[in-house]
Regions:
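Alpha-helical transmembrane segments in multi-pass membrane proteins
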Residues: 1, 21-38
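Central hydrophobic cores of alpha-helical transmembrane segments in multi-pass inner-membrane proteins
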Residues: 1-11, 46, 73-79
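Membrane-interface helix-loop junction between the first two transmembrane segments
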Residues: 5-25
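Membrane-helix interface/capping segments
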Residues: 15, 45-54, 86-93
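Helix-boundary and loop/linker segments of multi-pass membrane transporters
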Residues: 17-23, 58-65, 99-100
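Membrane-embedded catalytic scaffold of the fatty acid hydroxylase/desaturase
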Residues: 31-41, 64-189
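Juxtamembrane/interfacial segments at transmembrane-helix boundaries in multi-pass membrane proteins
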Residues: 47-70
Length: 189
């Protein structure tokens, strides 16, 4: 909430407001619903992941090694990419994800505009990480970092970031992802 207020204040300061009250309230409400449904996701997927991790994992990665954390972060992002891509290209996934793209504005509150039904399918994409032995607490940590990273890219106040744009999701290229022009729909994930 502090980040949203800071972005709002900055937008007012430079005379480039990216917030509409009704749109922001809708985004915040949807975000709170997702938070509530997240409890169900943690319970259900946590149980499934635990069973996979303890009974079916091919080996156990050592969480004391930095390479485990780097691997887990990159692999999590890889599977997130495929989940996100499927969320655009498959209708059953799109039915859940479309709410995120319905905001009239593009700001940090848009990042919170998430459906409460996404957890029904998103957890499936991360099963391979548990099968190859990524520890649960490493997954929770890198998943949280990924979520934090996804938040800041929903701002119109951050300019292009040079070479970084070529390799990572940034506010600039994610704005294109949220564009509604036919030319840009489903072009970058």
């Amino acid at each position: 909430l502090v980040a949203l207020l800071l972005e709002l204040a900055y937008g007012k300061l430079i005379n480039k407001n990216t917030y509409k009250l009704n749109d922001t309230i809708s985004s915040l409400f949807m975000g709170s619903l997702r938070g509530t449904s997240g409890i169900l996701k943690i319970g259900f997927s946590g149980y499934v992941y635990y069973q996979i991790e303890t009974h079916f994992a091919l080996w156990r990665m050592d969480s004391n090694l930095w390479i485990t954390w780097i691997f887990a972060f990159v692999a999590y992002d890889f599977f997130y990419y495929w989940f996100h891509r499927f969320s655009h290209e498959r209708q059953i996934f799109w039915a859940s994800h479309v709410a995120h793209h319905q905001s009239e504005e593009y700001n940090l509150s848009t990042a919170l505009r998430q459906t409460g039904t996404g957890f029904f399918i998103s957890w499936i994409f991360y099963i391979p990480l548990f099968l190859i032995g990524v520890p649960s607490y490493v997954m929770v940590s890198v998943g949280t970092l990924n979520l934090i990273y996804q938040f800041w890219v929903h701002s119109r106040h951050i300019p292009k970031l040079g070479w970084y744009e070529l390799f990572f999701v940034t506010p600039s290229n994610h704005r294109v992802h949220h564009a509604q022009n036919d030319l840009y729909i489903d072009k970058n994930y």
